[in-house]
Amino acid sequence: KADRIQDLWVMSLPNATPESVGVSTVSQRDAALKGNGLPWMMLPGTPGAHIMIPINPMVKSSTISDQAADEIAQALLPLPEDLRPTATVYKYDRKTGERIVLRKGTGYVECMPRDPEDGFTRCMNVVSAPRRDMAAKLKAQGKSEAEVNEALAAATKAGTLKPTPFGTLSYRLYGKKDRIQLLWVLSVPGATPESIGVSAAPQRDNALSGNGRPWLMLPGTPGAHIMIPINR
C-alpha cells in the first residue's frame, strides 16, 4: 500500500553512529513516500543500529544536477541537505598532493569539488581522510593507481594506516547521463553475498535507466562495497 515505504532495504550496522558511518539520522520517510527518499540511520549507537535504504520508483527523467553558484556549494551537492552546513570542503594541490581547505567544517563528512579529470564530485567520512591524503601525495609523485593501491595496502597491513571501517559511507555525484549520477557507496570490507545477503549482479544499466537497486562489488576483498544508486 502507498501509506508506507513500498520498497525498502535495511542494512544492519550494530552500534554504528552517524560519525562512524558518515550518514544522516534525519528521517526520509515522507520524502520516500513521495518517491524521492535518501538512506538514513535509525537507532544509532545501539545493537539495533541500521541504515534504511528506500528504493525510489523508476524515474523517466532525472532531476539530478551537479551545477551550483560557486565551488563550495557545488562540492556539497552529493550530500543530504542536513549534512551540508557542517561539512568541510577541500581539494588537493595536484603538484604536491597537499590538502587545501576551502571551508573548515565541524561535521563528520568532507567534500571535494568536481574533479576536472573524471567529472565526479565526492563526499566522504572524515575517518578515511588519512588514506585519501596519502593517496594524493603518492599520485603527485607520479605513482600509478596500482602503485598507490599497493602502498595503501602495505601501510594498512603494517598498522601505520587504519583500514576503512565497516559501514563507512561515501557519496558521488556526476553531472552527465552516461554514468550513474547520484551514487552512495557503503564500504563492507571482506563481505560476500552470503554474509550480508546482497546480490553481486551489477545494476549499472538499470540505474542508468532510472531504476537501480543496490549491489555488491569486489566481494570477499578488503575493498568490498555496496553500490547504492539513488533514483531521482
Locate predicted features.
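Primary mode marks residue(s) on the alpha4-beta5-alpha5 output face of response regulator receiver
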Residues: K1-R232
